[in-house]
Amino acid sequence: MKEIVFENISKSYGKTKVVNNLNLTIKEGERLIILGPSGCGKSTTLRMIAGLEEPTSGKIYMDGKCVNDVKSGDRNVAMVFQNYALFPHMTVAENITYALKVHKLPKREIDERLKQAVDMLKLNGLEDRKPKDLSGGQRQRVALARAVVKRGDFFLLDEPLSNLDAQLRGHARKELVKIHEIYKQTFIYVTHDQVEAMTVGDRIALMNKGDLQMLDTPANVYNKPRNIFTAKFIGSPATNILNINYNRGYMSIGEQKIMIPEMWRDLIDEQGNIGLSLGIRPEHIELTKEKNSDAYMGTVKYIEDYGNKYGVYFEIEGNEVIAVMDNCDLKSNDIVYFLPNFEKIHLFNRETEISIGYPKELE
């Protein structure tokens, strides 16, 4: 199987560890997104796959073979960089076909692959231009075409859309998925953009400070976050995190308490005596001005108008919380009542920051 396996991989630069004991299997033919903030180790991980960086410890397997000592040029990968890395003195066609000519493929094969890539990525009529005569979006498509024609077993993309405007990024995301559906290569795609990750990926590997935080489908990363970092990083506005106290079926925020459903009581009781944090997404909060003794009471601080929705910032016992609402008749200093949707909340161990509902075998 043409899969990639990281076995206890670490990478350090001097005393700085940028990837920490990474264990990860990238399945044959999938689109895996390596997502995370700047400095999390995602690009270093990709460069180790490409052979541009050597791991400090651990082993990398590609197609069942350890490749720690295999040179980059012998790994059968195609890579697209953030800065395109086009040869400025070559035409579009020459840039796209350069690697094919180096490997001495027959001219007919080269011409066929060039035509397919040019047609697919809408580069018709640009074949004789130099990179300086192209827009940023066109240069990006040339870089993608160059990787497509190589048809390596593994397609590596390092922040490939970060230099494009929003409209071009949306189009390019669809083109990348289309390319994958045609060639069925294994895609490993690095980005800091959660929209790209959610729309392009079959699975997301979320990293932070060199550690793998969660590996799962986009839906599960969003709806079933493994830990507080995942809950806050995925989604905008970010998930609200509030420290709570639990006692005999009641969940307290400061001096206010409400009873919680039995399913959550049983799960909390199984954890023993631990501190808890409540996580709830802004879009899963409902606010009302009607007094409700079974809800938390807060005060509206300010409201943001997003055009199609509203962001309502309110305060509960000194904690700032944001709710996203379709319609809003609230104003600053209004008293509001908030009852969590217990089917949508997340409870985390305050010390480990791991979800108490996350399957232990996946931790």
Describe every region a protein language model picked out.
Residues 5, 25, 61, 337-339:
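ABC ATPase nucleotide-binding domain
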Residues 50:
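Helix-to-loop junction immediately C-terminal to a conserved catalytic motif
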